[in-house]
Each structure stands twice: as C-alpha cells, then as structure tokens.
C-alpha cells in the first residue's frame, strides 16, 4: 500500500542529500594540465573555472597557447562531468530501492 509519510520522508532526505552534494561540489577542486604543465586550469565541482595558470614562455606564441588552453579546458571539463556522474551514482545508490512505499515489492 502507498505510504505518503514514507515517501515524504524519503523526498526530504533526498533534498538534504542533494544540497550536501552541491555544497561538496563547490569545495571540490579539479585540475588539468597541458603542454607538460605549461598551462593549468582548475575548476570547482560545479564547473566554474577558478584558476588558470600559463607559463610565461607561451605568451609570445599565440597559436600554441590557444591549443594548450583548449586542451586543458576540455580535460578539466571532462573531469567535472565524470565527477558529476560519479556523485549522481553515489546519490542514487544511497537512496535505496524500497519500493514498498509505492505499494510494490522490492526486487530480489
């Protein structure tokens, strides 16, 4: 039988977990380097760029700088996406699979 109280408690818990996850993402720092460390880009877990470091030797070589910057940005973007997917899977796994609140039977 459907249990609205259980569903409400589960949704409240899920909202708290999502808020906690968002706060942790703000604190998570992901970085990528290219050109053997000549260019470095750091983002937080929400994908906001928080730091870019460029070696002075690249400042007069615009084309190389552009290529290395694009590479580092793409790599850190991929890291952010991987982190988001991992966090979402952890969130999903932490929710449990008790279908009794919907009147169904759990798998297994």
Curated annotation (Swiss-Prot):
From the Swiss-Prot or TrEMBL record, state where the protein is found. Cytoplasm, Nucleoid
Could you list this entry's UniProt keywords, alphabetically sorted.
Cytoplasm, DNA-binding
Where is it mainly found? cytoplasm
GO: which molecular function terms?
DNA binding
Gene Ontology CC annotations of this record? bacterial nucleoid; cytoplasm
Q: Which Gene3D superfamilies match?
A: Nucleoid-associated protein YbaB-like domain
Give start-end ranges for the coiled-coil region(s): none
Q: Which domain of life is it from?
A: Bacteria
Q: Which NCBIfam families match?
A: DNA_YbaB_EbfC (TIGR00103)
UniProt record similarity statement: Belongs to the YbaB/EbfC family.
Quaternary state and interactors: Homodimer.
State what this protein does: Binds to DNA and alters its conformation. May be involved in regulation of gene expression, nucleoid organization and DNA protection.
Q: What protein does this entry describe? A: Nucleoid-associated protein HH_0332
């Amino acid at each position: 039988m459907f249990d609205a109280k259980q569903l409400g408690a589960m949704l409240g818990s899920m909202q708290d977990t999502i808020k906690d996850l968002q706060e942790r993402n703000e604190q998570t720092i992901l970085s990528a380097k290219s050109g053997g460390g000549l260019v470095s880009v750091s983002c937080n877990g929400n994908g906001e760029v928080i730091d870019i470091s460029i070696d002075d030797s690249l400042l007069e070589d615009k084309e190389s700088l552009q290529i290395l910057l694009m590479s580092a940005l793409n790599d850190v973007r991929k890291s952010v996406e991987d982190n988001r997917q991992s966090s979402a899977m952890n969130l999903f796994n932490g929710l449990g699979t008790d279908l009794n609140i919907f009147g169904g039977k759990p798998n297994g």
